[in-house]
Every structure is written in structure tokens, then in C-alpha cells.
Regions:
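Elongated alpha-helical scaffolds
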Residues: 102-105
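Membrane-embedded alpha-helices of multi-pass transport/permease systems
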Residues: 75, 120, 127, 184-187, ...
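Alpha-helical transmembrane segments of helical membrane proteins, especially in multi-pass transport
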Residues: 174, 178-210, 224-246
Length: 288
């Protein structure tokens, strides 16, 4: 009877260890896969992300918003001309050279406005180039080696049946946590790209104010917002990279149960930091 009980216990332990390792191997695979997916997503330009949406946004910007921006630029240029005339004692002390300066300034403003879409895309091309360069470093440093899982399996073999059962249930719970994390990351990454499209669609309006000293703050803040949203992808990538490196310690900590709960803690921390990436990026670029 004792031999049968021991055999059943060993069989259950083997079954639980196999289940735990299966859950954790899937967990590690999810981490590595998610890092790779985010590297691709945040490193994709608006034009390459979705050609259909990009074409729609470009048409809206050029056919609907640009005429409104043209009216705003006309108002700004006329206002500056009137202001320049009144400042010189109703043209009694007016310098003809100021007219040439005004013409040159207005011409530059028209040129910038007519190329607004290309300028906005150039901002994102710069940020995506930086992100793509960093992605190669990040994905190369977050691989989980088989040796780590082997060390964890050796630790599990020394545990009792009850502890293994509790650990199995916890490892099962962590898989659902990872699914929630994947959905959350999906919302953050895709939400950022939608925000980029929204900013791009209205780009001509703030750009039309750049040439004016009083109204130019709108355009300057808009450009800062573009850089902030662009480089938010870099912060997202850094957050996930830090998370993946921290997760590597789960297989070498010597305490499987503590490692499982540590993984949950890291997951919650990642979710919190992903929510903060937009705020941090805007504070860096002084955008509001």
C-alpha cells in the first residue's frame, strides 16, 4: 500500500511539475513574443501601419482642414501687416524694407503650410528610426534560455505535493494575467497610433499660426506634442524591455512561489508605467 501511495504521489508530482513548466514556458514565450511585437508596432510609421487609414487621414487633412488653415494664415498675415503699419506712426516712419520682410515671412509660412503633411511625417520618421534602432538591442537582450527553466524544474522536483498543487494553481492564474496584459498593451500601442492619426488630421490649423509671435504658441505646442507622441513609443519599448529583463530572474531566484507573485507584481508595474509613458513624454517635451 505504501509503495502504491508513493507511486501515485510521484506520478501526481510529475504531472504538476509538467503542468507548471508548461504554464511558465508559455509565460516566457509570451514575454519574448510581446517584446518583439511591440518593437514592430511602435517602430512602424503611420504610413506603414495601415495604408487605408493613412490615406483617409491625408485626404481629410488636405481637402477639409487645409482650406480652413489657409483662412487662418490669411488672417494672421493681414493682422501682422496692419500691426506693422500702425507701429510706424501710420506709415509716416515706415521702412519699405519691412514690406519685403513681411512678404518673405508670409511666403515661408505658405510654403510650410503647403508641406504640413510631409513635415509631420518627417517628425514621426525620426522618432520611428530611433525606436527601430533601440528595438534591435532590446530584443537581443531579453531571450529566456533553456538553462533557466532547467534550474527551475530542479527546484520544483524537491517540493512536496501540496506546494506543487498550490504553485500549479498560481501559475495557471498568471497565464490569465498575461492575457490581460496583452490586451492592455494592445490598447496602449494601438491607442497611441490612433492619437498620431488624430494629431495629423488637424495639423494644418496649428501650423498656420507658427509665423505669428502672439499666436505661434499654438503651433509650437503642437510640434512638441508630435515629438512627445512619437517618442512615447521609445518609452513603451523601454518599459517592456525592463519588464522582460526583470522576468528573467523568475527562473533563477530559487523560490518558485515568490517568483510567481513577483511576476504578478512586475505585470502590474508594467501596466502602471505604460499608462504613464504619455505623461512622461509630454513633460519631457513640455507639451500640454
Amino acid at each position: 500500500m505504501g509503495i502504491l501511495t508513493e507511486w501515485i504521489t510521484e506520478w501526481l508530482k510529475g504531472l504538476l511539475i509538467e503542468g507548471i513548466m508548461g504554464n511558465l514556458e508559455g509565460l516566457f514565450d509570451t514575454v519574448n513574443t510581446r517584446v518583439g511585437e511591440i518593437s514592430v508596432q511602435v517602430g512602424t510609421t503611420p504610413a506603414a501601419w495601415n495604408a487605408g487609414v493613412f490615406s483617409l487621414i491625408r485626404q481629410l487633412s488636405e481637402t477639409v482642414i487645409s482650406p480652413i488653415a489657409g483662412l487662418i494664415l490669411t488672417f494672421v498675415a493681414t493682422y501682422e501687416l496692419i500691426q506693422m503699419i500702425l507701429e510706424k506712426n501710420n506709415m509716416h516712419e515706415f521702412d519699405v524694407a519691412n514690406i519685403y520682410k513681411w512678404v518673405f515671412k508670409t511666403t515661408c509660412a505658405i510654403l510650410i503650410l503647403s508641406n504640413t503633411f510631409n513635415i509631420v511625417m518627417a517628425v514621426f520618421d525620426v522618432s520611428q528610426s530611433v525606436i527601430a534602432s533601440a528595438a534591435g538591442i532590446v530584443t537581443g537582450a531579453t531571450d529566456i534560455t533553456p538553462d533557466m527553466l532547467a534550474d527551475l524544474e530542479m527546484t520544483l522536483e524537491t517540493m512536496e505535493l501540496g506546494s506543487l498543487l498550490g504553485l500549479f494553481l498560481q501559475s495557471f492564474l498568471i497565464k490569465f494575467t498575461m492575457l490581460a496584459l496583452n490586451i492592455f498593451i494592445f490598447v496602449i500601442v494601438y491607442g497611441r497610433m490612433i492619437e498620431i492619426y488624430l494629431l495629423t488630421s488637424l495639423a494644418p490649423i496649428p501650423v498656420a499660426t507658427l509665423s505669428n509671435r502672439e499666436l505661434g504658441a499654438m503651433g509650437q505646442n503642437y510640434l512638441r506634442s508630435l515629438f512627445a507622441v512619437g517618442f512615447q513609443g521609445m518609452l513603451i519599448l523601454v518599459c517592456v524591455a525592463i519588464y522582460a529583463v526583470l522576468i528573467q530572474g523568475i527562473a533563477t531566484g530559487g523560490d518558485p512561489i515568490g517568483a510567481i507573485w513577483g511576476c504578478i507584481g512586475y505585470t502590474v508595474l508594467l501596466c502602471f508605467m505604460l499608462m504613464k509613458t504619455g505623461t512622461i513624454s509630454k513633460s519631457i517635451f513640455s507639451a500640454h
